[in-house]
Design a protein with these regions (language model features):
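Short low-complexity, flexible loop/linker segments enriched in glycine and/or proline
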Residues: 304-308, 351-354, 496-498
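A mobile, often basic/glycine-rich helix-loop segment
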Residues: 346-369
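Conserved S/T- and glycine-rich ATP-binding loop of Class I adenylate-forming
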Residues: 236, 339, 420
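Cysteine-centered catalytic environments shared across enzyme families
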Residues: 1-310, 322, 474-475, 480, ...
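Short acidic/histidine-rich active-site segments
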Residues: 333-343, 347-349
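Adenosyl-5′-phosphate
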Residues: 10-11, 135-136, 141, 167-173, ...
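Active-site nucleotide-sugar/metal-binding loop of Leloir-type enzymes
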Residues: 328-330
């Protein structure tokens, strides 16, 4: 971070660590207090339409003393009350306090791009962007939340809000405001919901019509995310999604666009990088491109740092990749655009076609996505943690909620509003912010997400998935990148646990702390340790790494 600040008044205290991206002057310092309006704010994120909102507010007579987005939030709250959030385009977590009433308002953006954790404590409430910050002063219940444990081990490590693995720490759900009264009473309300309803005009549009409409929406989303007082770069994996973003940034006129790609050592014949495809795109658009190669030894040496940086345990193998990539990128860039969200929003995953016309979409979704069924979960954890099958109940409730009738769209909605929030987006925000790097995700522009929800599912499933997005991409990026086999962010050393990582996992699971916590059955752990590569989840993750990482994270942050 570039600077920090603290403000205390009566029973309330506020702290902030600032990354200077919009308005680099001291005028935009936080906590920001406006004595004239009797309001103060701490805010993490970026409001891309702040110039337009500023002009509206100036027309109402508001005077500004800074040029960034933070002050716009304060004035907007004063002008429009809590409904001001519906006018925001961006990613945000904020706390606004009213001097005279003593009331506090917490808010989190629609797609949960920015985190907001809170912990009720004796006589008060703590909140923070980082979960470990809540634990630093003690007094927080760090026992395990049984429902969260079931989610973590069953639902591909997705722990939906308000749960975290710690019983005393909650997270504000995306698209939610929490009002806190001076006497401590709390109330929440949702200000956004994703709806897959479409009118007759939407139904009648052709694939080609949707391609053009989508391309316009993509252009707007990428252009909005160029609003900054520092250069904006891009993470370029070599896949369709990040390549399309680079193409759109180049089309928007970004000069000397910096792009970055990370790769790892091959393991057991499995390729650890996709440099060749990123190079094709970098050459096509003349970017200032950097290949970042991480030797296996560095990966293993730096893994403890990545675990320490995690707000919650994140089992995806690419977490360490994003951590090391972010460190390298932060030497040259403060802001990057990144391609998370396209698979969830536009239907790129392999389970969506299986759901088309499904008679039992809940069962079919769980069969494809779940790491363990309930019987295996009962065999994994000790009896005191058995409880209910929280993840299956959660999926069923989500699929039965109004707003999505088609089985594919039920899955798209759940993946966009929950899985995406709690896995790829959380991972990227957490690991980039560890190095003061801001990642902006144009595929999660809420207007683009709403547009995508109107596109009929069969257009998304076309051409092997993401059909309408791929067709839009053909107008900008090379076919070789679009027609390649689907890739991912490969870190083979974590998929096939062996050597030092296996020993670290073994140590974590056999430690005194693990025995005292008593989460896992010894016979189950021994079975996994005997042959780690034989126990892989349907989504190709290591079951042993899930257990080991959870214990490692708890030992790092809780003890």
């Amino acid at each position: 971070p570039d600077s920090g600040g603290v403000f205390a008044q009566g029973a309330q205290a506020w702290g902030h660590r600032r990354l200077k991206i919009m308005d680099l002057s001291e005028s935009a310092q936080q906590p920001m207090v406006d004595p004239e309006l009797g309001l103060g704010i701490v805010f993490n994120g970026a409001i891309y339409n702040h110039p337009e909102l500023r002009r509206e507010l100036e027309a109402k007579g508001y005077r500004f003393y800074s040029h960034g987005d933070t002050e716009v939030l304060l004035k907007a709250y004063h002008a429009w009350g809590e409904d001001f959030v519906s006018r925001l385009n961006g990613m945000f977590a904020f706390a606004i306090w009213e001097r005279d009433s003593g009331r506090v308002l917490l808010g989190r953006d629609r797609l949960g791009i920015k985190p907001l954790y809170y912990a009720p404590i004796a006589g008060g409430l703590r909140f923070a962007s980082a979960l470990p910050a809540l634990l630093a002063a003690g007094g927080v219940d760090t026992s395990i939340d049984p429902a969260a444990l079931n989610h973590y081990l069953s639902f591909h490590a997705v722990v939906p809000a308000p749960h975290t693995l710690l019983a005393g720490v909650r997270k504000l759900a995306p698209g939610t405001l929490m009002r806190i009264e001076p006497d401590g009473r709390r109330s929440e309300r949702s200000f956004w919901a994703l709806d897959y309803a479409r009118d007759a005009a939407d139904e009648s549009r052709s694939f080609e019509d949707w391609t053009e409409i989508l391309l316009d929406g993509l252009r707007a989303a990428v252009r909005r995310r160029l609003v900054a007082d520092v250069p904006v770069g891009a993470l370029l994996s070599g896949g369709v999604d990040s390549s399309l973003i680079v193409g759109l940034m180049a089309e928007a006129g970004v000069k000397e666009l910096r792009t970055y790609n990370v790769g790892f050592a091959d393991v057991g014949g499995e390729k650890g990088n996709e440099f060749e495809y990123a190079d094709i795109v970098a050459r096509e658009f003349g970017t200032v491109h950097e290949r970042i190669f991480v030797p296996e030894q560095e990966l293993l040496t730096r893994l403890p740092e990545a675990v320490a940086a995690m707000n919650e345990p994140m089992v995806s193998h690419d977490c360490i990749g994003f951590y090391l990539l972010s460190e390298a990128v932060s030497r040259h860039s403060k802001v990057v655009q990144s391609g998370q969200g396209a698979d969830e929003v536009f239907g790129g995953y392999h389970w969506y076609p299986k759901l088309a016309g499904s008679a039992d979409p809940v069962a079919d979704y769980l069969a494809a996505f779940r790491d363990r069924d309930y019987d295996e979960y009962l065999a994994t954890v000790n009896p005191r943690w058995h409880g209910v099958d929280a993840s299956a109940a959660f999926v069923a409730a989500s699929f039965n909620a109004p707003g999505a009738d088609d089985p594919v769209e039920k899955a798209l909605r759940l993946d966009t509003t929950v899985m995406l929030v709690e896995d790829p987006v959380k991972r990227v925000d957490n690991m980039t912010m560890a190095f003061g790097l801001e990642a902006r995700v144009p595929f999660l522009d809420h207007e683009l997400v709403e547009l995508a929800a109107r596109i009929p599912a069969h257009h998304k499933l076309a051409h092997g998935g993401k059909g309408v997005l791929k067709e839009a991409a053909r107008k900008l990026i090379p076919d070789a990148v679009i027609d390649r086999p689907k890739g991912y962010f490969p870190v083979p050393a974590l998929k096939y646990l062996q050597g030092p990582v296996l020993e670290r996992v073994r140590d974590a699971l056999s430690s005194q702390s693990a025995r005292e916590r008593g989460l896992f059955r010894k016979d189950y752990v021994d079975t996994l340790l005997a042959d780690p590569s034989a126990h892989i989840t349907p989504l190709r993750g290591s079951k042993l790494w899930q257990l080991g990482l959870l214990e490692w994270w708890l030992q790092t942050h809780v003890g």
